[in-house]
Each structure stands twice: as C-alpha cells, then as structure tokens.
C-alpha cells in the first residue's frame, strides 16, 4: 500500500497486469496524483504517442526483444492514458476499447470465426476490403481511399492509395513503365528549372515521389522503409567522411564546401 501524507490506495505486486496499468493511470490522474499527469489532454500527449510508436518500430528493426518489450509497454501506456481521459468524460473506458477491437477482429475474420472460405492471404485481403466497405458504409473505392488516414507519413499513405486503386480495378503498370514515367517527370522538372519557370515545382516533385511509391510497391518493397534505410546509409557515409577529415586534425565545418563535395563524391 502506498503511504504518505496524501496516500492513495494501491497494492504493490511482484507482477502486474493490464488492470493494474489502468488503475495506475487513474491514480496519476486523481487529485492526489501527479501534477504533470493531471493536466494532460489528448492533444498534449499526441506527439508522445507518435514518438513511442516510432520507437517500437525501431526496436522491431533492431530485432531486440527486450527493447521491443519496453517500447510496446510505452505504447500501451499511451493507449490506456487516452482511454482513461475518455473514461473521465463518461464516453468510454479501456474495456470498451478492448471490446470494440475484439468484435472487429471477429467480424473481419469470418474465415476463422464463421463459414467464409479464404485459403490464401490474397483472398483474406479481398474479404477484408469488402467487410470494411460494408461496416463503414463506403459505397465507392474513392471513399476507401479518402478513409486512409491523412496523419500517416506521406510515403506510407501513397503506397496504401496505390493498393486501394489496384483493388478497385486500376491495374498497376510494370516496374519498367513506372521507371519511364519517373524519368519523364524528372525531365519535366529539369526543363522547368532550365526555363526558370514559375510553375510549382513542389507539385512536380510530389508527382515523382508518388510514382516512386508505386514503383516500390511493384518491386514488393516498402517505400518508407527504403527511405529509412537510405537515411541510415547517408549518416554512415557522412560519418566516414567526417572521420577521414578529422584525421588531419581539421573539423569538417572548417573545410571549403567545394572540397567537402569533392571528398563526398569520391567516397561513393
């Protein structure tokens, strides 16, 4: 039992479960709780939620089970915190959230919990699309595209849109055709730059990036992860460059940009 001048009721244990986590958040939000936790809202911890999910993804990429366990706990804490905020308003609680997702999983897996037949992952996905459209009362493929979260990173959102379009009957181009389209887009951008055109180059770049996500899908790779890995390689390459310059007792910031560029290109 917690003790103190303003003690709260809580039983310490050797091992806790999800019900304990919900109770801990309730205590933190109570009048006797934490000054910081008491004043948080959905909006103030929104960014924390996003960051925790990304940290969990990083743990997955690292294939580090202990790190993943920790980060999944942080994600779960955020889920519980948001649920407790709603519980305080009398709208729903954590159990309502669990109940809702259980019912959704049962409803979306009639091939497991019902009599629908689906022997391949492709058949499962086809069933899911039909079920989602029905449950969300979506009458067109466009509506399914509009339902893709706008808060997603744009590379992920674009690739999901390509998938929705394909399932809606828009057959994808071959990888070779997409590369030709990307080359044509780059040529238009180069022409615009040469002409000092007042055209919106961000639109041209956006079109090229969108085509690139389609190419990634055609090559069965994730555009977001591809760029993530490229960022890592960029850092590694720059680190090698900086260390090589440092061997001469010079900081890279003090080297002429033209020289840095030459050294950079030579490291390719």
Identify the role of each PLM range:
Residues 2-71, 77-205, 209-268:
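Flexible "arm" and connector segments at domain edges
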């Amino acid at each position: 039992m917690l003790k103190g001048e303003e003690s709260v009721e809580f039983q310490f244990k050797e091992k806790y479960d999800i019900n304990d986590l919900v109770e801990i958040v309730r205590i933190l939000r109570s009048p006797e709780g934490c000054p910081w936790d008491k004043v948080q809202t959905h909006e103030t911890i929104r960014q924390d939620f996003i960051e925790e999910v990304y940290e969990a993804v990083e743990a997955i990429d690292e294939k580090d089970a202990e790190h993943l366990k920790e980060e999944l706990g942080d994600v779960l804490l955020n889920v519980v915190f948001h649920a407790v905020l709603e519980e305080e308003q009398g709208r729903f609680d954590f159990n309502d959230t669990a109940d809702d997702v259980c019912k959704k999983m049962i409803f979306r897996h009639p091939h497991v919990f019902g009599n629908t037949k689906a022997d391949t992952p492709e058949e499962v996905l086809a069933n899911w699309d039909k079920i989602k459209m029905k449950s969300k009362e979506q009458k067109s493929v466009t509506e399914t595209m509009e339902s893709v979260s706008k808060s997603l990173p744009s590379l992920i959102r674009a690739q999901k849109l390509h998938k929705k379009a394909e399932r809606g009957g828009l057959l994808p181009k071959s990888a070779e055709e997409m590369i030709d389209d990307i080359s044509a887009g780059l040529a238009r951008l180069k022409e615009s730059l040469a002409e000092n055109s007042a055209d919106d180059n961000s639109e041209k770049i956006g079109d090229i990036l969108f085509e690139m996500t389609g190419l990634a899908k055609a090559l069965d790779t994730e555009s977001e992860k591809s760029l993530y890995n490229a960022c890592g390689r960029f850092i590694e390459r720059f680190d090698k460059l900086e260390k090589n310059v440092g061997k001469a007792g010079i900081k890279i910031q003090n080297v002429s940009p033209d020289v840095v560029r030459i050294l950079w290109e030579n490291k390719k």
